[in-house]
Structure formats: structure tokens, C-alpha cells
Amino acid sequence: MSKAVIVIPARYGSSRLPGKPLLDIVGKPMIQHVYERALQVAGVAEVWVATDDPRVEQAVQAFGGKAIMTRNDHESGTDRLVEVMHKVEADIYINLQGDEPMIRPRDVETLLQGMRDDPALPVATLCHAISAAEAAEPSTVKVVVNTRQDALYFSRSPIPYPRNAEKARYLKHVGIYAYRRDVLQNYSQLPESMPEQAESLEQLRLMNAGINIRTFEVAATGPGVDTPACLEKVRALMAQELAENA
């Protein structure tokens, strides 16, 4: 069986939430919640936190996790993952966002199984259905797919354009990726494309190079932590979840 690892990029610096990976959520740093959920994903050999700050490294080691130091000049999580790829041997690398403490392990398992079911598949990601109102938000990245669930395009604009609104169905892109090793080996050689620069979406670099990205649709996911308001919402939801499971 192909070896799969989960890598959780965790930058300390954040303009809206400084020290974001270490923010407390129901008694644990956020990065610990993500790590513990990643450990629950079946079929994964290792889980690593990739960070650029010793404070995050120390926090991860304090709760018994594995952390790896990376450069602080990476432009994206994928660039950070490429550095990790040179240090951690695997066939499949799953890039799990460090600000998604409510990630469902079964969704990541769906992603991994899709990669294992089709050895020719280079990249995979997740999506879920959303309303037209949510699709109108530029902060929500949308994806249009074909009948095989392969991505045709990602955009911050509402796609497909609702010329016939009754027929439109919107899918939100969930920023979790699975990559084959060879894709990451070649990633740094791929030029930035005009769509990537215009939309500020790194996955468009892969699409511009003709690399297929398959999507797997899941149920609506929990909120990520992007702003102070998001943080308070996640704290409330996870406190409720903790109380229900007590």
C-alpha cells in the first residue's frame, strides 16, 4: 500500500490573528485539535506539523506531536509542503490546514481512499454544496466539476454564472489536498499563471500546467479560524461538542 502522511502547515504570523496555531480552544492550542483529529485518519503512516516558528514546534512537541521546522519565506502552504517532501519520505502527502480544528477525519479518509483507488490521479481535494448567497462571497472559493468530479475551474466569483438561476448548483472548495510525490517534486518549476495571480488561488498553477485535480464531495464542513469572530464561533461549537460527548 502506498505510504501516506499528513502535513499540517502552521505559520505563527497572522495579520488578523497573531500566534494563531497556539490560540486556546477549550483548553488546548488550536494546532493540537487539528493534530489529534489527523491522528484519527485511518491509513496514514505519520502526521507532521510544518512550522516556521520555534514556539509552535515546542507546543507540538509538548503534547507529544511531531513537528518539523521550515523556512519562513514560503508564499503558500504548498511551497512549505514541498520543503517537507524533501525531508519526509512518502508516496502521498495530505496538506491539512492548521486553522481547521473541526475537520472530520472521515472526510480526509475519503480523500485518501480516492487517491489509492486511482493510482494515476495526481491531486485530489474536497468540496461541498453551498447556497447562492454563500457563493456570492469572494472569500468563499468555488469549484466547477465535470461528470468525473474533476475540477474545471476554481474561482472567487460565483461559478457557474447563474444565467438560469434555477439550474445553478454551487460547490465550495475545501482547502485540503492530497498530492503524489512527483507533483510536489515538480511544483517549484511550474510558473505562476495569469488566473492564479488574478484570483490569488495557488491550485490554478496546477490546472494551468494541465495537472488534473479531482474533487470528492462531502457534507458541509465546520468553520475554519480566519478572524476573531470565527475563533469565537469555533470555541462555542467545540465547547458544545465537548459537553455533548462528556
Swiss-Prot record:
Q: Which gene encodes it?
A: kpsU
Per the UniProt record, one Pfam family is: CTP_transf_3
The organism sits in which domain of life?
Answer: Bacteria
State its Enzyme Commission number(s): 2.7.7.38
| Subunit text | Homodimer.
Enumerate the InterPro entries for this protein: Cytidylyl_trans, KdsB, Nucleotide-diphossugar_trans
UniProt family annotation:
Belongs to the KdsB family.
Q: Which SUPFAM superfamilies match?
A: Nucleotide-diphospho-sugar transferases
| Pathway(s) the chain acts in | Nucleotide-sugar biosynthesis; CMP-3-deoxy-D-manno-octulosonate biosynthesis; CMP-3-deoxy-D-manno-octulosonate from 3-deoxy-D-manno-octulosonate and CTP: step 1/1; Bacterial outer membrane biogenesis; lipopolysaccharide biosynthesis
Location in the cell reads: Cytoplasm
Q: Which residue stretches, if any, does this entry annotate as coiled coil?
A: none
Name any Gene Ontology BP term: lipopolysaccharide biosynthetic process
Origin organism is Escherichia coli
- Asked whether the keyword Transferase is assigned, the reply is yes
Q: What is this protein called?
A: 3-deoxy-manno-octulosonate cytidylyltransferase
Q: Name one GO cellular component term.
A: cytosol
